[in-house]
Structure formats: structure tokens, C-alpha cells
Design a protein with these regions (language model features):
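A structural boundary signal for the start of the first folded domain, especially the loop/turn
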Residues: 1-167
């Protein structure tokens, strides 16, 4: 018991815990995405047809608004909050201020990460519409329908934000 009261032992235990935590954190690498495709369907929630539709939307938005909506489907966030996991992916993927990231966790929940410009420009009504677009289908397990409806709504939101910025 005296050994546990020693500062040297306490410091050694602290170092071991910090190193172990750091190694554990580093071992969980984010899923990868191909630049300019922005769809990483690791959980297999989306059909090829849906993925192609999403890519078409992104190409159009990138040309018109310099914006994309990246999509990540995962089986788990590895005990991270969806918000933190989405932020990590957004940073790792190099998403910009005009972009959004839709994170879908299979059988669990989703999270939408907004780029700084979107977050500052979109109205509360527009953000509510984005949320409402995905809710029902997503929680009914209709991931294709939920994702496509989110993109349709995002198309309207991007157009409205573009009109507001041109005024």
C-alpha cells in the first residue's frame, strides 16, 4: 500500500493511463471517402441507385454553390457521440464552410453537421425542414428514402441561401 502512495508510482500509473488512452483513440481511424464522391456507405444502408443520385446532387451543388453534402453510414460510432464522430469525419475529409455531413448510424440515429457558412446563413425554419425531411423514413428503417428526401430538401435550402446571399 505504501507503494501506491508514492508520487513516482502515481506518476507512472498516470503516464500508462494517458498513453493507453491515446493509443486507443488513435486506433479508431475514421472511415475514408473518395474526394469528390463524398459517399461512404460502410454500413451498406444505401442502394447503388441512391448513391448515384446523391453524387449527381453533389456535382450540381459543387458547380452552383461550391458545396456538397457528404454522407457516411456506419454500424457504430465506437461510443463517441454522433456529433463528435461527425465533426471528426468532417475534419478528416476536409469539408468546407459551405458543406454538410449526414452521418447515419445503422439502427440507431443520425446527425447532420453543418459547415460554418451554412450554420450562419440557414434560418431556423430551413434547419427544421432538413430535420423533418429525414426523421420519419430514417426511424422507419427506410434509409434510401430518408437520405434522398434530405438531399431534395437540401437542394431547396442551398438555392434559398444562394438567393439570400445575392441580395
Amino acid at each position: 500500500m505504501k507503494a501506491l502512495k508514492s508520487r513516482g508510482v502515481a506518476l507512472a500509473v498516470l503516464v500508462v493511463v494517458v498513453v493507453a488512452g491515446a493509443l486507443y483513440g488513435l486506433s479508431r481511424k475514421p472511415i475514408s471517402v473518395e474526394y469528390a464522391k463524398w459517399i461512404a456507405d460502410d454500413a451498406g444502408l444505401l442502394t447503388a441507385e441512391t448513391q448515384q443520385s446523391l453524387k449527381d446532387y453533389n456535382e450540381n451543388w459543387n458547380d452552383k454553390y461550391h458545396a456538397v453534402v457528404a454522407v457516411a453510414t456506419v454500424d457504430s460510432t465506437h461510443r463517441w457521440s454522433a456529433e463528435r464522430y461527425a465533426a471528426m469525419l468532417g475534419k478528416a475529409w476536409g469539408l468546407g464552410q459551405n458543406d454538410m455531413l449526414l452521418l447515419e448510424v445503422k439502427g440507431d440515429h443520425y446527425y447532420v453537421l453543418l459547415g460554418d457558412s451554412v450554420n450562419q446563413t440557414a434560418t431556423d425554419t430551413q434547419i427544421a425542414k432538413l430535420k423533418n425531411a429525414i426523421e420519419k423514413n430514417y426511424y422507419d428503417g427506410e434509409y434510401d428514402g430518408a437520405t434522398l428526401q434530405f438531399f431534395r430538401t437540401a437542394d431547396v435550402v442551398y438555392a434559398q441561401m444562394s438567393q439570400m446571399s445575392q441580395r
